[in-house]
Amino acid sequence: MIIGIGVDIIEIGRVRQAIRNNKNFLSKLFTEREIDYFISRNMNSEVIAGNFAAKEAVSKALGTGMRGFSFKDIEILRNELGKPEVILHNGANLIGNKLVENNNSLRVHLSISHNNSSAIAYSVLEGEYYGNI
């Protein structure tokens, strides 16, 4: 059963500017594994903006926005084929588990795309619905 959906779009230029103007921007919002992925992609602003939009989309699908957890509690990685995968930690994981009957049944689907100026992410939460947060 679909439990939640979320979408977010962001201007890549705003992310590029934040990276330039704030030396702590990446370390405040992204895990070490995410930053390692960005480095492997030559610190491509489109990739970073896509991950930022993905975190926002997942937070909206959880039904809370970025309340009750930090940006780092939603980790966006890629599998061996490049498909984005979501790992929920700490507060985000607790909120996700409150939504499903069986803690292991929550599945987070994610799609990320971008053009020259914007990045967009769409997330769907699926599982056996248990109740509200």
From Swiss-Prot:
InterPro entries: 4-PPantetheinyl_Trfase_dom, 4-PPantetheinyl_Trfase_dom_sf, ACPS, Ppantetheine-prot_Trfase_dom. It is found in: Cytoplasm. One of its GO terms (cellular component) is cytoplasm. Keywords: Cytoplasm, Fatty acid biosynthesis, Fatty acid metabolism, Lipid biosynthesis, Lipid metabolism, Magnesium, Metal-binding, Transferase. Mg(2+) binds at residues 8, 56. Its EC number is 2.7.8.7. NCBIfam families: acpS, pantethn_trn. Belongs to the P-Pant transferase superfamily. AcpS family. Transfers the 4'-phosphopantetheine moiety from coenzyme A to a Ser of acyl-carrier-protein. This is Holo-[acyl-carrier-protein] synthase. It comes from Clostridium perfringens (strain SM101 / Type A).
